[in-house]
A protein has these predicted regions:
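N-terminal amphipathic/basic-hydrophobic helices that include classical n-h-c signal peptides
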Residues: 1-12
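N-terminal beta1-alpha1 ligand-phosphate binding loop
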Residues: 12-39
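A structural signal for isolated positions on well-ordered beta-strands in alpha/beta enzyme cores
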Residues: 14-18, 46-48, 113
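Conserved RecA-like P-loop NTPase ATPase core
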Residues: 17, 83, 117, 150
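Short glycine-rich anion-binding loops that position phosphate/pyrophosphate groups of nucleotides
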Residues: 23, 87-90, 118-121
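S-adenosyl-L-methionine/SAH cofactor-binding core of RNA-modifying enzymes
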Residues: 43-45, 49-110
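A mid-sequence interfacial segment
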Residues: 98-137
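Structured adenosyl-cofactor binding patch, chiefly the S-adenosyl-L-methionine
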Residues: 124-168
Length: 169
């Protein structure tokens, strides 16, 4: 596979991370902001928050997933590549994840949309629309904690693709 080690802005690729619910803690938001700012050097990157459901406490788990699913799918365009962060997804080491991103960008995808679901995961409709599922770990993390972890992993992937010293083998 040919490596495209360049500023991906040239190819108009955009990475969007969708997350359900506002970020609860300022230190979590600081982590997201830190890596979002660093990523702008490489690619168009956006972290979008889908507002919490109103009356969430009065909804069943399946109702929450269905309603959140509708909100997620409203944000997704027909040409997007929808990738879910899911505990049953494929696990990558950092180099493998950078290769995964490279492959998607080389395929001419204009928007890679990664979704961090709510506390109960995703609706069947969201699973049906997704092209891939990835897992960051076999361990379970809150949907809040995953936000800065995943932003850092995307940054790490781009540092690997650009042969920069951030990642150590």
């Amino acid at each position: 596979m040919t490596n495209i080690v360049a500023n991906y802005k040239t190819f108009l690729v955009k990475i969007v991370v969708l997350a359900i619910g506002k970020t609860d803690e300022s230190w979590i938001q600081e982590g997201i902001d830190k890596y979002s700012k660093r990523l702008k050097h490489y690619i168009y990157f956006e972290f979008q928050i889908i507002p919490d459901l109103k009356n969430r406490k009065n909804l069943s788990e399946s109702q929450q997933k269905e309603q959140e699913g509708r909100l997620i799918l409203k944000q997704v365009q027909n040409t997007d590549l929808l990738i879910l962060l899911d505990e049953k997804g494929k696990e990558f080491h950092s180099k493998g994840f950078s290769d995964f991103l490279q492959q998607k960008m080389n395929a001419g995808i204009k928007r890679l949309v990664f979704v961090i679901g709510g506390p109960y995961g995703f609706s069947a409709e969201v699973y049906a629309q997704a092209t891939s599922k990835i897992a960051l770990s076999k361990m379970t993390f809150s949907h809040q904690m995953i936000r800065p972890f995943f932003a850092e992993q995307i940054y790490r992937a781009f540092s690997i693709l650009n042969n920069e010293p951030y990642h150590h083998q």
